[in-house]
């Protein structure tokens, strides 16, 4: 049997009733049989600190390892003040550091979002 395509997904909202978390759950149900999608909760990733980038907290190590192991990345995020939420930017910064060890290198990344408006 061929290896399934691995998709790592995460959301850009901390809100319990997040529309974007619901969007990820819906996307997970629509994943084709030749793929699998894991949703990673980035809420516990601490503020990026460059002094710790060579030995980051365990959750950052786990996040980076999952990104590196995935074939593709899916991010569902709301728009806050014409941009992405700060904690999502923080998670992306944490996974792309230190220089030369960017977990996203070579990964296709898709963004999607949902809102009531």
Where are these regions (language model features)?
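Short, flexible hinge/linker loops that cap or flank conserved catalytic cores
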Residues: 1-2, 103
